[in-house]
UniProtKB/Swiss-Prot annotation:
Name of this chain's protein: Ribosome maturation factor RimP
Species this protein is from: Nitrobacter winogradskyi (strain ATCC 25391 / DSM 10237 / CIP 104748 / NCIMB 11846 / Nb-255)
Domain of life: Bacteria
GO cellular component labels: cytosol
Compartments reported by the entry: Cytoplasm
GO BP, one annotated term: ribosomal small subunit assembly
SUPFAM superfamilies linked to this entry: YhbC-like, C-terminal domain, YhbC-like, N-terminal domain
Keyword Cytoplasm: yes
Underlying gene: rimP
Pfam families: DUF150_C, RimP_N
HAMAP family hit by this protein: RimP
Length: 260
């Protein structure tokens, strides 16, 4: 018997491992948080432990489609707080913060590099590639176990315009904020919000359209008795003659044109 979850793309994305992970204390928090998030239908993106203004533990999470709402963050915080209190991965008081990955998000999974192909990214390597650790350029997708990057940071003619960066050797990767990225993020956000509202019954489905509704497709326009097609929207009369006549009518000089 086939496992239904194996055919569900959301389950495949939930099970996809992160290739870029955190060291130290953040790794301990990630080991605790990831299973809880996955059980709720979310993916862990990044853990960041900061000592500024006290200790803050920031957990970035998302749905399999890359979206997340304020309600999701509240639900995650409510479920994760008691688990972290029991496991106690940090030996001092801290503030838990649940957030979205943001527009200029970290890239931590293979699907991230594939999804954002065509967008500008910055990549820092844990292992140097041809003597360099930092690269910037347009993502060109993934081939085998490496990210193809078309560089825009070339400084001399000896540098390669395209490089293949092994994903397991990447220490940090994130998108660069551009107008194109902002536009796509807004588009995806609107689509995700619309789908969520429709699934909750808050937003009715879109009305049928003649181009998509089979019942309306090919329906002829009504005709008059003489066989001519009924006119569509009649445009306003805006010839010079009508404008002059309207002005004279307004001044009371003449009667309107016959039939008008």
């Amino acid at each position: 018997m086939t496992d239904p979850s194996a055919q569900n793309p959301d389950h495949e994305l939930l099970d996809e491992p992160r290739l870029v992970v955190e060291p130290g204390v953040a790794a301990r928090v990630a080991a605790i948080a990831a299973p809880v998030l996955q059980g709720m239908g979310y993916r862990l993106v990044r853990i960041k432990v900061s000592g500024e203004a006290g200790c803050t533990v920031q957990i970035m999470a998302e749905r399999p489609d890359g979206s997340i709402q304020i309600e999701d963050c509240e639900a995650i915080s409510k479920a994760l707080s008691p688990v972290l209190d029991v496991a106690d991965p940090i030996d001092k008081a801290y503030r838990l913060e649940i957030s979205s990955p943001g527009i200029d998000r970290p890239l931590v999974r293979r699907s991230d590099f594939e999804r954002y192909a065509g967008h500008l990214a910055k990549i820092e390597m844990a292992v140097a590639h041809q003597g360099r650790k930092r690269f910037r350029g347009v993502l060109q997708g993934v081939e085998d176990n490496a990210v193809r990057l078309h560089r825009d940071d070339i400084r001399n003619n000896d540098d390669e315009s395209e490089v293949m960066l092994v994903m397991e050797d990447i220490a940090d990767a994130r998108l660069v904020l551009t107008d194109e990225l902002i536009a796509e993020s807004m588009r995806r956000g609107k689509i995700a919000e619309r789908e969520m509202k429709q699934s909750l019954g808050i937003l009715p489905p879109p009305p049928p359209h003649a181009k998509t509704d089979p019942a309306k497709r090919g329906t002829p326009k009504p005709k008059l008795e003489n066989g001519k097609k009924a006119p569509g929207k009649i445009p306003p009369k805006n010839t010079k003659e009508h404008r002059l006549a309207a002005e004279r009518l307004r001044r009371g000089d003449i009667d309107p044109i016959e039939g008008e």
